[in-house]
Structure formats: C-alpha cells, structure tokens
Amino acid sequence: MTGRNQHNGFQFATAVQPATGAYMSAFGNNSETEYSEEDGEAFELRSRGRERHHRSTSRDRKDDIVYLIREIKEGDTLISISLQYFCTVADIKRANNLLTEQDFFALRSLRIPVRKFSSFTETHNTAPHKSSSPSGTCRITETPVSGASLDSTSSSSSADSVECFLQEKDKDIQQLVKSSAPSRNSLSEVVSSLEQPLLGDAERRPAIKKDPYYGADWGMRWWTAVAIMLVVGIVTPVFYLLYYEVLMKADVSHHTTIDSIRPGPTQPAIAEPLVLPQANAAPHQDSHLLPVIEQQHHVKHQEET
C-alpha cells in the first residue's frame, strides 16, 4: 500500500504541449489529462450583489444613451460641440475612438452621446428606435432650431426667475408699507419722487450758488486782480510823484516870499547930542529945520525900542 501510494502520489509536470482546442499536461507517471475550454467555462465565478447591481445600473445607463450623428462644419471644435449638446469632451472622444483632439479634424461626421428622452431627441423628427446595436444611433443634420429652442428655454427660465424675484420684492415692500402706517405720507412722497422721470429731477434741483468768498483769492475775478495791480503799480506812483513835485514847488515859493517880505539887518543909529539953542545966541540959519530933525530922531528911537 505504501509503495502504491508513493507511486500514485502527485507528480510535477515534466512537459506541456499546446493543442488545438485543449491543452495536455504530462506527469511523471505517464498519465495524460486533457482540459477543454468548455470545462474551463464551467468554473466561472458568480458576482456578488453589489457588483451585480453596479453592472445592472451601468447597463441601464448605456441603454439610456443615444448617439446622434452630426456633420462637422467649419469652425466646429470638440469644446463647442460639448457645450452645445451638454456632454463632456471625454464622452465624445470615447464614442468616436479619438485618442487626441487632432484626430477630430480628420472626421467628417461625429457621434454625440445624448440622453434617450432629452430635448435634443425630441426636437428632431427621427426619434431613436430600438436597433440591433445595444445603443441606438440616428443621423441628424444641425439645424438652428435646436439652438433657438435652447435659447428660448433659457431666456424663458431666466425671465420666470426674474419675475418671481420681483414679485417677492413687491410683497416685501407691501408688508413694509402696511407695518409703517404713520409714515405712509412720507413713503408716498418717496414713491412719487422715484416714479418721476430723471429729467424732472434735474429741473427741480435748485441751482447751487457758489460762495463769493470761496478760494484763496477770496472770490475775486481776474479783471479785479488786473485792476488792483494797475492801481498799485502805475496810478499810485504817478500820483505820488505829482504830489511831491507840487509840494516842492509850493515850499520853494513860500520861502521866497518870506525872504522878500522880511527886512534886512539895520545898523544901530548913533544918538547925536542935542544942541539946545542959547537964549542970547543969534538964531541959526537952519532953525526952520529943527522940528523935522526932532521928528526923525523920535521915529528912530521908537524903532530901536
């Protein structure tokens, strides 16, 4: 038994020769064992629950995607097409087997992955039907209808959002007006002033008066400054010179008149001795001149005193 077990024990493979449809292994005990591909498929492992769910969701996603065939025109790029059809550049590359962006310029048409029930499939007459391939394709030609519809939908949505926002603001304003009943008059005045056109506001604004004493020049105009400079620089010196000349002439004439009126220095008169006539003497031949001489002496004496 022991020898038999040793003879029938596991032996390493000594040679492997490939064959068509199967492979053969030769062991040390010269026993041959063949395994076919069908036997190998019988041992396929089953996937777990999460992997099965992930595969089912991925298959559902692939079923939801439809490929639209679009002709490439001049000026088209991968980025512009991806923005137009709301898909990524990687999805477009994957659908068209593009390795680089330069391969895009060698194509005449492009497969674009879109959702099955999206606005892009609804706008076209050729609705995607179930085809033999797992994901259906439909050929389209680019028309401006899709862009216009997108613009109209986006503009309508933006208009609706703006209207909702304005309505909410109106409600808030109405609540504020109701809560502030005492100041309703002031609010009405504010609303009326806001509703008036801008031209009326410009007309109603009073003209701002400029301060006449504003600035470093104290509000003077340029002609006022020129007049002051002329008065200080020309008129004042001329008047001063004229006044000085007239004053000098008047002073000189005054001195000359005083000198002419004032008498010159007089020599002191020598008193002559009076000779009284003797009683017994004979009368002088000039006795008739004595009263005149006495009068002159009297005048000189008064002048000296």
From Swiss-Prot:
Cellular localization per UniProt: Cell membrane; Golgi apparatus
Record Gene3D superfamilies: LysM domain
Record field: compositional bias (Polar residues): 121-144
One Pfam family named in its UniProt record: LysM
Transmembrane segments: 222-242
Record topological domains on the Extracellular side: 1-221
Glycosylation (residues): 29
Broad class of the protein's primary localization: membrane
InterPro entries membership: LYSM1-4, LysM_dom, LysM_dom_sf
Stretches assigned to the LysM domain: 68-112
Gene Ontology cellular component terms for the protein in this record: Golgi apparatus; plasma membrane
Cytoplasmic-facing ranges: 243-305
GO biological process: Golgi organization
Keywords: Cell membrane, Glycoprotein, Golgi apparatus, Membrane, Transmembrane, Transmembrane helix
Region (Disordered): 31-60, 121-156
Biased composition (Low complexity): 146-156
Topology in the lipid bilayer: Single-pass membrane protein
Task performed by this protein: Essential for Golgi structural integrity.
Protein name listed in UniProt: LysM and putative peptidoglycan-binding domain-containing protein 3
